[in-house]
């Protein structure tokens, strides 16, 4: 590969085909952190003195995000910077989540970061395994169902942790996959909600995505080079539904045309910005919401997705929900 195109001193380790850079391992790590720092600055994601909740699952993306944000907070100029809190959700996937949660706890202990953990069982009265026990004959994907509950769980953890902003580890691949899926589903309204920095007028916590401009492959390499122990096994439910097909298609496109994901990302941001300005959201990235008729949480419709999904689960599962959960849904 030759010498590093950045420092010119060490042998190159990784080539970014979309930019032509051939980087040594240290320069790759440094430029990845710099890219995240620029993204945070570009979208005004974080402010000094804020309490930042980092959604940490135990996978490569979330652990890398936690380490990068911790690094950006470190050093002699760290006074007045963000205070980090890890927000971890236990979905209840037997044989999978225990390892990831252990990795999350390990990095939090190493970095001295507070951790707040919530579970589906405590919040909704059932685990993800229980919720999906009935789903074999239905068209709804596991990821769609889990996503609804996971977003609510992170919100609940954020409130308990009293944070000002939640940082999630969605990378560039996640972003363009979601953009493509919304296009394929004809969901124009959701396209207006894809801003890397969003807020709801009825919810006090902002949501930001600092890894938005980093390829998934590069996040994985950063985690490897940083010697971050993370769960490499995929969720047993992740290969269901449209997202898996979209992921494979975009990866094939990128392999043939390096940089295509960056082009799609720029297009997605342009569409999101235009829809926001055209009034499909309240201001820059703010969603228009109403209180859910059942739980009172902010919702884009009369009844929120969590309440609708919970009712579906209770109607089809083979277990009896706890009395407390039934009372909360009424």
Regions found by a protein language model. Give the residues of each.
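ATP-dependent adenylation/nucleotidyltransferase module used to activate substrates
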Residues: 3-181, 185-192, 197, 201, ...
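ATP/NTP-dependent adenylation/nucleotidyl-transfer catalytic domains that generate, transfer
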Residues: 1-30, 35-54, 82-83, 190-330
């Amino acid at each position: 590969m030759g010498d590093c195109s950045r420092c010119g001193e060490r042998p190159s380790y990784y080539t970014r085909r979309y930019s032509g850079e051939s980087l040594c391992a240290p320069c790759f790590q440094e430029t990845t952190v710099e890219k995240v720092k620029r993204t945070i600055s570009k979208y005004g994601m974080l402010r000094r003195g804020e309490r930042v909740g980092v959604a940490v699952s135990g996978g490569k993306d979330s652990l890398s995000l936690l380490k990068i944000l911790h690094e950006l907070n470190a050093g002699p100029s760290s006074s007045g910077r963000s205070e980090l809190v890890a927000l971890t959700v236990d979905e209840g996937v037997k044989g999978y989540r225990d390892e990831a949660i252990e990795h999350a706890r390990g990095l939090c202990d190493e970095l001295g970061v507070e951790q707040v953990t919530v579970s589906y069982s405590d919040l909704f009265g059932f685990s993800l395994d229980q919720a999906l026990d009935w789903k074999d004959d239905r068209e709804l994907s596991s990821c769609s169902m889990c996503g609804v509950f996971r977003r609510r769980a992170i919100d609940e953890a954020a409130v308990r942790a009293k944070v000002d902003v939640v940082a999630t580890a969605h990378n560039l691949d996640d972003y363009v996959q979601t953009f493509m899926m919304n296009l394929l589903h004809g969901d124009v309204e959701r396209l207006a909600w894809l801003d890397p920095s969003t807020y709801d007028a009825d919810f006090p916590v902002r949501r930001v995505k600092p890894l938005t401009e980093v390829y998934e492959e590069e996040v994985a390499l950063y985690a490897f080079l940083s010697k971050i122990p993370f769960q490499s096994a995929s969720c047993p439910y992740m290969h269901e539904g449209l997202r898996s097909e979209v992921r494979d298609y975009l990866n094939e496109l990128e392999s043939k045309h390096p940089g295509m994901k960056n082009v799609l990302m720029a297009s997605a941001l342009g569409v999101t910005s235009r829809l926001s300005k055209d009034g499909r959201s309240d201001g820059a990235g703010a969603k228009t919401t109403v209180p859910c008729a059942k739980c009172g949480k902010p919702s884009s419709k009369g009844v929120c997705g969590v309440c609708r999904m919970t009712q579906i689960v209770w109607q089809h599962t083979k277990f009896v929900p706890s009395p407390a959960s039934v009372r909360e849904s009424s």
